[in-house]
């Protein structure tokens, strides 16, 4: 991902304020509610029968935290996202058979959640930088599919 020095600063500064546990669970939960067909990858998570059930599900929250932990690793290696996400790309492609379009959806949901949490601090410039990052991460996760 090519980010200007200002964009890198904007991304890392905001990310330093992110509560990964809270934002991760909310982002994954919103993905499952807004795009219900994605729930098929999480059938082992128990009750996903309603938006409240999804958002309160401890397995959704725990996996969301794990997902955002991996995203944090990507932020530390913006110049090598494909390498950073190679194993996760392989896992999601070969073993889990996740449609790579879902990575884009999750990235966009994450941007919405960040905007919700940070309000005015999440300026258009910060959003533009994050859109680049989530697109780069989605591309890296889809790399094994090509």
UniProtKB/Swiss-Prot annotation:
Residues with S-nitrosocysteine modification: 93
GO molecular function: haptoglobin binding; heme binding; hemoglobin alpha binding; metal ion binding; organic acid binding; oxygen binding; oxygen carrier activity; peroxidase activity
Modified-residue entries (N-acetylvaline), positions: 1
Cellular component, GO, one term: blood microparticle
Gene Ontology annotations of biological process type: hydrogen peroxide catabolic process
Location of N6-acetyllysine modifications: 59, 82, 144
Tissues of expression: Red blood cells.
Positions annotated to bind heme b: 63, 92
Sequence ranges assigned to domain Globin in this UniProt record: 2-146
Residue positions where Phosphoserine is found in the record: 44
Residues where Phosphothreonine is found: 12
Pfam families, A to Z: Globin (PF00042)
UniProt cross-references to CDD domains, sorted A to Z: Hb-beta-like
Keywords: Acetylation, Heme, Iron, Metal-binding, Oxygen transport, Phosphoprotein, S-nitrosylation, Transport
Disulfide bonds: none
PANTHER family listed in its UniProt record: HEMOGLOBIN FAMILY MEMBER, HEMOGLOBIN SUBUNIT BETA
Family: Belongs to the globin family.
Subunit structure: Heterotetramer of two alpha chains and two beta chains.
Biological function: Involved in oxygen transport from the lung to the various peripheral tissues.
Name of the protein in its database record: Hemoglobin subunit beta
Organism: Chlorocebus aethiops (Green monkey)
Lineage: Eukaryota, Metazoa, Chordata, Craniata, Vertebrata
